[in-house]
Amino acid sequence: MSYNILRHRDHPGGLTDPGLLATIREDLARDGWTLLRGFQPDMEAFSGVVTTLCRRVTFDPARSHTTDTTQMVDAGLGPIGLHIENGNTPRCPDIVTFFAQTAAFEGSQTTICDGRAVWDRFDDALKVRWSQRMTVERVLPEALWKRYLANEHPAISDPAQVTMEHVLQFKAAIPDQDFALHPDGSLTYRLTLDPVRPSALGGETRGFANAVLGPSHNYQPPRYAMADGTEVTPEEIERIRALAEEVTHEINWQDGDIAILDNTRVMHGRRAIADANRNLFIGMGTI
């Protein structure tokens, strides 16, 4: 994986420089990620990057908003395993962007890992197993699933507007998902997906890009089951985690950095936070 840094001195027009967007897309197509450094953006400028790259913006319903298109990242202080953002939702973002408004003095490096490199490290048995489809199942509290649906359904914008008709419409619009509603308003959600996939940005090369190795911050831990009926075990996850660590790299943040990732190819995580004086924001969506 190349360590791509696009610097302001090479793009004097700043974040709206005509050549910058083309270079970002070249880096994403080649390496799956890039880093913008020295542009000194504010939150409005970061939001502009998100809307330029993403035709449609999406959110994590458990996070607080900072603008109409961005949210604050707040996931405790411990390390976070590799994952794609919103990887267990029916509309997985194609692009995820991070803005280090204030970088930590120590620790808190964002880890990045090309799913194609992980897939290349799988032996034949692992490749056969993970070429199957996988079902994710978890229980979502009423507040979270209604916030998600209010953002994703085109006819509503407020969780208070959600009705069962909207739920059924969303289910019909996106295949491979099912649910069971409970008396307390919570919902058992099931999504069947491909844990190994080609990038949404183009090309046929597949990569291990999913949320199996990742956290469940703000959510109930999911249950993962393969198409053959077997569950994904903790031992299996740790084996893959070790393989992925061999090809994992770190972003050592500087104030004002913006990282842009192909969320259908490159997984990300975080080292433990040693300096809590940091502010990181996220924006994501579909191309």
Annotate each PLM feature.
Residues 1-13, 66, 76-82, 91-287:
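Active-site environment of non-heme Fe oxygenases that use a 2-His-1-carboxylate facial triad
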Residues 1-88:
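N-terminal non-catalytic cap/leader segment that marks the start of a structured domain
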